[in-house]
């Protein structure tokens, strides 16, 4: 059994620690607030973020980052905007060659870089693996069957992570397409916000199905333009994650979208949700990327207008419905062309 450290004691970090601990691994769950970690150790439960889930004896909550020195694998479970800063803080503790698994689903604001690119810059002596897929912490913590995907340019590292994470209730696939896996996990949060808008406005299943279907089409367009394999967006990190995030009561992005659709201001919504809503930041980045790559992303554009330009969600839905006539098969043809380009030339790994 392996020695594993999870840095970030929120709901997802705790759920992964519990899953790996039940598999027999020795897991250090590292948080920044010493008093909270001491309380978690006493209670054997993370009441603020994952109430009702008992920590197995193999999971040790701690505020001491020094335990990272012993880790064979580090699972980084912090918000996307904290990834670079966190990597800078902890890199002195890591042994050379320690595998680093990123679980955040977002992009770096300003640079537009994927988080594996950020980690490669800050931790150049460590294999970087990304984990994504339809996986709410509340369900993983309760041992409900869950399937995810890990991706890396280092196939041996990806397979090592697969072996360490796999349990009878937590199935892990591998995928060499790091770009597609990261972008699918990040961009689906935008569509989840929009699905929430629709629910908040009182619209029905037809509307949500349209948003999800057309949403995955525009995610795939931009993802392929950025070097991802279009097939990845039809898998766990794309359609799979999109479905669960757009339909689940556990989804922060969907809950935030519902509140916005009901007319609440963004600042109030973010305060009420209480945890990071990745889709808000990602909407701005995706909007800027769509303009950079000259890719049509009408749903993302309307989400941007609602979040950052004060547009009314109902008007945004009307704008989408009143767009010029299109032929759906053109979308399929474009994706097929991009897929052929990917297979012929391989992914643009941007130096990874």
From Swiss-Prot:
Its EC number is 1.1.1.94. SUPFAM superfamilies: 6-phosphogluconate dehydrogenase C-terminal domain-like (SSF48179), NAD(P)-binding Rossmann-fold domains (SSF51735). Belongs to the NAD-dependent glycerol-3-phosphate dehydrogenase family. The active site is at 188 (proton acceptor). NADPH binds at residues 11-12, 32, 105, 137, 252, 276, 278. It is found in: Cytoplasm. Keywords: Cytoplasm, Lipid biosynthesis, Lipid metabolism, NAD, NADP, Nucleotide-binding, Oxidoreductase, Phospholipid biosynthesis, Phospholipid metabolism. It catalyses: sn-glycerol 3-phosphate + NAD(+) = dihydroxyacetone phosphate + NADH + H(+); sn-glycerol 3-phosphate + NADP(+) = dihydroxyacetone phosphate + NADPH + H(+). One of its GO terms (molecular function) is glycerol-3-phosphate dehydrogenase [NAD(P)+] activity. This is Glycerol-3-phosphate dehydrogenase [NAD(P)+]. Its main location: cytoplasm. Catalyzes the reduction of the glycolytic intermediate dihydroxyacetone phosphate (DHAP) to sn-glycerol 3-phosphate (G3P), the key precursor for phospholipid synthesis. GO terms for cellular component: cytosol. Sn-glycerol 3-phosphate binds at residues 105, 133, 135, 188, 241, 251-253. Coiled coil: none annotated. Pathway: Membrane lipid metabolism; glycerophospholipid metabolism. Pfam families: NAD_Gly3P_dh_C (PF07479), NAD_Gly3P_dh_N (PF01210). GO terms for biological process: carbohydrate metabolic process; glycerol-3-phosphate biosynthetic process; glycerol-3-phosphate catabolic process; glycerophospholipid metabolic process; phospholipid biosynthetic process.
């Amino acid at each position: 059994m392996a020695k594993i450290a999870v840095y970030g004691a929120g709901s997802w970090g705790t759920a992964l620690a519990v899953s790996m601990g039940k598999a027999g691994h020795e897991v250090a769950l590292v948080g920044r607030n010493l008093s909270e970690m001491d309380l978690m150790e006493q209670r054997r439960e993370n009441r603020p973020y994952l109430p009702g889930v008992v920590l197995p004896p193999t999971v040790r909550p701690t505020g001491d980052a020094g335990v990272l020195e012993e880790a064979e694998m580090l699972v980084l479970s912090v918000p996307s905007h904290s990834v670079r800063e966190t990597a800078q803080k902890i890199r002195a503790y890591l042994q050379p060659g320690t595998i680093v698994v990123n679980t955040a689903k977002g992009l770096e604001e300003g640079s537009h870089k994927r988080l594996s690119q950020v980690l490669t810059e800050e931790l150049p002596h460590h294999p970087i693996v990304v984990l994504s897929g339809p996986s709410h912490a509340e369900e993983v913590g309760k041992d409900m069957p869950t399937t995810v995907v890990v991706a890396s340019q280092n196939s041996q590292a990806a397979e090592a992570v697969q072996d360490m994470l796999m349990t009878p209730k937590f199935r892990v696939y591998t995928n060499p397409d790091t770009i597609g896996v990261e972008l699918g996990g990040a961009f689906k949060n935008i569509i989840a916000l929009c699905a929430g808008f629709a629910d908040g406005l009182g619209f029905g299943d037809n509307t949500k199905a349209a948003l999800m279907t057309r949403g995955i089409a525009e995610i795939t367009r931009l993802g392929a333009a950025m070097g991802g394999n279009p097939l990845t967006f039809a898998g766990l990190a794309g359609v799979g994650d999109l479905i669960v995030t757009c339909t689940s009561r556990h989804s922060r992005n969907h809950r935030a979208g519902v509140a916005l659709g009901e007319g609440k201001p963004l600042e109030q919504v973010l305060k009420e949700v209480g945890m990071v809503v990745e889709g808000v930041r990602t909407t701005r980045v995706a909007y800027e990327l769509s303009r950079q790559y000259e890719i049509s992303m009408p749903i993302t554009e309307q989400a941007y207008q609602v979040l950052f330009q004060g547009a009314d969600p109902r008007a945004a839905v009307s704008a989408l419905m009143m767009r010029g006539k299109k032929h759906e098969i053109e979308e399929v043809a474009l994706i097929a062309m991009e897929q052929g380009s990917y297979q012929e030339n391989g992914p643009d790994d941007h130096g990874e």
